[in-house]
Amino acid sequence: MINIQKTHPLLKIVNNAFIDLPAPSNISSWWNFGSLLGICLILQILTGLFLAMHYTADTTTAFSSVTHICRDVNYGWIIRYMHANGASMFFICLFMHVGRGLYYGSYAYTETWNIGVILLFATMATAFMGYVLPWGQMSFWGATVITNLLSAIPYIGTNLVEWIWGGFSVDKATLTRFFAFHFIFPFIIAALAMVHLLFLHETGSNNPTGISSDADKIPFHPYYTIKDILGVLLLILALMILVLFSPDLLGDPDNYTPANPLNTPPHIKPEWYFLFAYAILRSIPNKLGGVLALVLSILILVLMPLLHTSKQRSMMFRPISQCLFWILVADLLTLTWIGGQPVEHPYIIIGQLASIMYFLLILVLMPMASTIENNLLKW
């Protein structure tokens, strides 16, 4: 009897991607985050769709429409908080996923890696535009500050900012277009994720050792489907604990005040997942320099395959590189903390040192450590 899952044009694709896919036998829980990101995306699209049914993208009614969702719509409060905190879970999974790629040398698959970087940018853009939609104080001023950064671009900067705003300030036109883009982007992200997967399946997955696993493969189903389901259950558990017990933990109290262009909040800061980049931006006194550092702090990931000087792919057997990797993680946590602090002593100097350390680690110290480890292998 012919197996339909192996012959049907559509089922064949699903079968080759999620069922009969040959996977390394030794991939750890760090490989769970790809599937978790997929679940996060589906969850965000579904909750977002139901929110869009009740939301109005107009400056006069946006804030009250969100209030209406939370107070009057059946289970509107849980949909809204699942969407808001789902974004936080999304970024936690993203950072873990990227960190895994850096640690185990997954960036050697350059096409997969570069599409991943594009996905990261697209997700950050989507989250930023989504944060503007409730039209609270932090929404308005966050949008004003971040879009204004583009005015640092020589010659075309000012025109570009006014073009994005659709006027001379963040207003009705800005909110409407941000809603339109925020709605369409997740579907673009989903399409890019499929391309990401397509390129990954050209080479097969990496594994913790960084050594070819062609000699020892196991089918994705049932082994990794079960493993992924466990990850999904833990993700949903964490999300629901956040949503049901402390839904506003990661939000900003200022966003419960309707947007007022005449009143600037004392501390304008983005959501927690952008704070590390915001700290790097603020650590440079020059506007254009800050914007460049901000973009490069993420774009530097594209250089990872070029900066890899080690004879080994993974950091599993490279203690010096491991040490530097965890220093980098600590540095990013420091930057995240600094990004949420006011611009005053000693936070300014800590932020500047942490920013220098960030670029120094990636561009200089880690490639040097790899070279040292290569020489140690000769002993």
Swiss-Prot record:
Binding locations of heme b b566: 97, 196
A molecular function GO annotation: metal ion binding
Residues that hold heme b b562 according to the record: 83, 182
Cofactor(s) annotated in UniProt: heme b
Subcellular location: Mitochondrion inner membrane
Matching CDD domains: cytochrome_b_C (cd00290), Cytochrome_b_N (cd00284)
Amino acids binding a ubiquinone: 201
Membrane protein topology class: Multi-pass membrane protein
Residues spanning the membrane: 33-53, 77-98, 113-133, 178-198, 226-246, 288-308, 320-340, 347-367
A biological process term (GO) from this entry: mitochondrial electron transport, ubiquinol to cytochrome c
UniProt xrefs under InterPro entries: Cyt_b/b6_C, Cyt_b/b6_C_sf, Cyt_b/b6_N, Cytb/b6-like_sf, Cytochrome_b, Cytochrome_b_C_euk/bac, Cytochrome_b_N_euk/bac, Di-haem_cyt_TM
Keyword set includes tRNA-binding: no
Cofactor comment: Binds 2 heme b groups non-covalently.
PROSITE patterns listed in its UniProt record: CYTB_CTER, CYTB_NTER
Gene3D superfamilies for this protein: Cytochrome Bc1 Complex, Chain C
Statement: the UniProt record of this protein carries the keyword Transcription regulation: no
Protein keywords: Electron transport, Heme, Iron, Membrane, Metal-binding, Mitochondrion, Mitochondrion inner membrane, Respiratory chain, Transmembrane, Transmembrane helix, Transport, Ubiquinone
Main function: Component of the ubiquinol-cytochrome c reductase complex (complex III or cytochrome b-c1 complex) that is part of the mitochondrial respiratory chain. The b-c1 complex mediates electron transfer from ubiquinol to cytochrome c. Contributes to the generation of a proton gradient across the mitochondrial membrane that is then used for ATP synthesis.
Misc. comment: Heme 1 (or BL or b562) is low-potential and absorbs at about 562 nm, and heme 2 (or BH or b566) is high-potential and absorbs at about 566 nm.
Subunit structure and binding partners: The cytochrome bc1 complex contains 11 subunits: 3 respiratory subunits (MT-CYB, CYC1 and UQCRFS1), 2 core proteins (UQCRC1 and UQCRC2) and 6 low-molecular weight proteins (UQCRH/QCR6, UQCRB/QCR7, UQCRQ/QCR8, UQCR10/QCR9, UQCR11/QCR10 and a cleavage product of UQCRFS1). This cytochrome bc1 complex then forms a dimer.
PANTHER family registered for this protein in UniProt: CYTOCHROME B
Entry similarity comment: Belongs to the cytochrome b family.
Name of this protein: Cytochrome b
Protein's gene: MT-CYB
